[in-house]
Amino acid sequence: MSMPLPMKLRTRLFLSISALITVSLFGLLLGLFSVMQLGRAQEQRMSHHYATIEVSQQLRQLLGDQLVILLRETPDGQALERSQNDFRRVLEQGRANTVDSAEQAALDGVRDAYLQLQAHTPALLEAPMVDNDGFSEAFNGLRLRLQDLQQLALAGISDAETSARHRAYLVAGLLGLVGVAILLIGFVTAHSIARRFGAPIETLARAADRIGEGDFDVTLPMTNVAEVGQLTRRFGLMAEALRQYRKTSVEEVLSGERRLQAVLDSIDDGLVIFDNQGRIEHANPVAIRQLFVSNDPHGKRIDEILSDVDVQEAVEKALLGEVQDEAMPDLVVDVAGESRLLAWSLYPVTHPGGHSVGAVLVVRDVTEQRAFERVRSEFVLRASHELRTPVTGMQMAFSLLRERLDFPAESREADLIQTVDEEMSRLVLLINDLLNFSRYQTGMQKLELASCDLVDLLTQAQQRFIPKGEARRVSLQLELGDELPRLQLDRLQIERVIDNLLENALRHSSEGGQIHLQARRQGDRVLIAVEDNGEGIPFSQQGRIFEPFVQVGRKKGGAGLGLELCKEIIQLHGGRIAVRSQPGQGARFYMLLPV
């Protein structure tokens, strides 16, 4: 048995709507035809009855005229004859035009009564009317006949109105039945369409729910609707493709997750992953050992298992998408009764759409590193103190020796003496830098704070370096914001920071370059920046540039302590210093000082 060809949804809807429209038009035409027929019949009947009333009125008028003629002293026979002829003519016209049998019989009665009246009329021309009783009876009989005719016509009009009203009710009932039929047909059609089209769609929806739950063994409905059938076939193809994809890809995904889990668990740093609600999704063994010890962190918030306020605030900021742009103080934790120092940093994880989806906390045990740095600082301090006295003595002795020696200016000996003097001066500066660095590292350096005018401070710094810039053909521009406040600063130390930044900018600027010395207020802080368009700083070096003994760029100078000293000075003032740079496009060092 062959399955009927599927009919398109558009065709089904067209046929259903066409059937409704056809029934509606049939009912409308039937109503119009009935109303027109009713009106035409009513008009004909009313016109006939009104014509009868008009005939009755004319006959009564003519009868009255004849009576007036007969009542005269000398009746006018000719006038009477004309009136009689008119009476007969009107009567015959009425009889000819009437279609109602009752009215026809009434008109016949009027004719007979008038003939009787005419039989007594000649005698009236010779004797008075009062002496003729037969005429009076005939006249009264005719008058009553005319009254009956008029009453009959009025009754016909009333009957016609009643009949028209009944027929109108009938037409209204028929139209109501047609309307009910249309509603029933529409309801049945809509229900049929909804059942035929809704059932397979509901089945597809249930199948989609099962697929969403991971069950791909679904039964799809068969239908003879072309569009729904096509949708069902494509849905089946999709389900089969998903089944195959799951079969081939789930293991790969799980394998990839296991590999990623192994990588996260094998790195030396502690790693904690937060979801967008601040709850811990994953912590590798190193992080659990360093931070949480005996607590299971999964599903908990950081403030439930770690009391450090800085870490809690940093997690909240990272979940808001804020990037941590400065080093945070080491985290002190107690592990197996031993105090450990952990360096940590937080990184927000954002969706391509821009909203936050979580954060990542990275921790590293720096206990040994900090101990080494402390030993190094102590060694540098002691070595600097031990070296400063003999080196200073050697420099003074060499200066006295140089004054006693007299070599020609162009001689080899003069060049050697000049080289030794420069290197000894450089060595003294290095020892002084080491001493200063050690003082800052050990907290021995104290600030001498005083109210400072930033405009005057930066203007003098510009004036100090303009000659050096002109010698290198580098322009130095000062850009000051409005209403810079006075700050409590150690002016000598801040001048040292600005001079160091300007010196570095000059060293790394090409001929024809530009340096901008800027200052402006930002809320409760003042930003001071030195920006150049020189060679820039490689990305790999930007994170280490403020570490001691680190030098970057092709042009070296000093011992690599300048930026470390700048950082220490700014931190003592309660501020911070940072850098932004694009290799080949220059660098911008900026510091933020509290107001």
From Swiss-Prot:
One of the GO BP terms on file: alginic acid biosynthetic process
Reaction catalyzed: ATP + protein L-histidine = ADP + protein N-phospho-L-histidine
Classification via SMART domains: HAMP (SM00304), HATPase_c (SM00387), HisKA (SM00388), PAS (SM00091)
InterPro entries membership: 2C_sensor_his_kinase (IPR050980), HAMP_dom (IPR003660), HATPase_C_sf (IPR036890), His_kinase_dom (IPR005467), HisK_dim/P_dom (IPR003661), HisK_dim/P_sf (IPR036097), KinB_N_sf (IPR038320), KinB_sensor_dom (IPR031909)
Taxonomic lineage from the root: Bacteria, Pseudomonadati, Pseudomonadota, Gammaproteobacteria, Pseudomonadales
Localization per record: Cell inner membrane
SUPFAM superfamilies (alphabetical): ATPase domain of HSP90 chaperone/DNA topoisomerase II/histidine kinase, HAMP domain-like, Homodimeric domain of signal transducing histidine kinase, PYP-like sensor domain (PAS domain)
Designated name of the protein: Alginate biosynthesis sensor protein KinB
Transmembrane region(s): 13-33, 168-188
Keyword check for Nucleotide-binding: yes
Histidine kinase domain mapped to chain residues: 382-595
Molecular function, one GO term: phosphorelay sensor kinase activity
Residue ranges of every copy of the HAMP domain listed in the record: 195-247
PAS domain location: 258-323
Function recorded in the entry: Member of the two-component regulatory system AlgB/KinB involved in regulation of alginate biosynthesis genes. KinB functions as a membrane-associated protein kinase that phosphorylates AlgB, probably in response to environmental signals.
UniProt modification remark: Autophosphorylated.
Keyword Transferase: yes
Membrane side Cytoplasmic: residue ranges: 1-12, 189-595
Periplasmic side: 34-167
Membrane topology: Multi-pass membrane protein
Domain PAC: start-end pairs: 327-369
Effect of residue 532 to E: Loss of autophosphorylation
Residue numbers carrying Phosphohistidine: 385
The enzyme's E.C. designation: 2.7.13.3
Top-level taxon: Bacteria
Major location (coarse): membrane
GO annotations of cellular component type: plasma membrane
